Amino acid sequence: DQTVQMLGFSQYTTQTRISSLNMFAYTASLMIGTAGLPHVIIRFFTVPTVKDARSSAGWALVFIAILYTTAPAVAAMARLNIMQTIEPSPGEYLKIDERPDWFRNWENTGLLVIEDKNGDGRIQYSADAETNELVKLDRDILVLANPEIAQLPNWVIALVAAGGLAAALSTAAGLLLAISSAISHDLLKGTFMPNISEKAELNASRCAMAAAIAGAGYLGLHPPGFAAGTVALAFGLAASSIFPALMMGIFSKTVTREGAIAGMLSGIGVTLFYVFQHKGIMFVADWTYLEHLTPHWFFGIEPNAFGVFGAIVNFSVALLVSQLTSAPPERIQALVEDIRIPMGSDVAVIHP
């Protein structure tokens, strides 16, 4: 905090992002969004029993908690390493000709840019845009660059790079599998075309996967923001659409199919409306609307943190529509009861 404040930045550990309400919404969106991620939910099909599923969920929560609690520490260390590289001691700035190799490597990618504004041959780093000479430092490079900045051994750098690549590929593969199976098996075969052949179902799965890859490629060319912000946005969309339906499907026997569908469409629709109003339709900056509204006009909430409010809309609409439509069939209500009370369990018995 002392080093950050010396350079004119806000204190790191006590800095509140816009407001306490916004921070609460951000945290809640990440929490419930995690529970609604499709590639996480699908992992429960890999265990044989309910007991193993619960154990798997418990261990998943442990590792997710470790990830969430250590991420701010990694960010703090990365920021401190960069500041100590540029300003090793108070008032002594790094000479441009003596900048380390990692500096030059990332300059070649265009993700790190310096500009000697005062012509003194040194790099000044400060919160003042007019005097700051580190004009661009892409936040997406910090995880990969941090071991090199800290001068760790090459094998550590390779391990971090391999871990990042493996995480990206495994997540992408899990999401593609979830998307393709949901559309081909659950939607087409389970709802609209129950007599569809296996070959047609496989072709539908391939088409859905190709469409998902095309959509991901488009978002790669027009990213909504830096990586962490984009991930938070994805968690918010999962929170506003999947999580409420998942919870009501487990704990409510009165929510109807029409209510669940209406709730999901309303939740994700409201969230996308708020996100696109800030970032442009399909994240194209020129395709904006309601420009007269101030940024974060809904109680100072950022678009990446809006997922929890979309979830509230989802719950409300689903419950309302369920009251206006016929009750679910008995077999569905029995299925919900069976989910909560697994096979082999029974009601509590009072022993004398």
PLM regions and their residue ranges:
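Membrane-embedded helix-loop-helix hairpins and adjacent transmembrane boundary segments
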Residues: 1-352
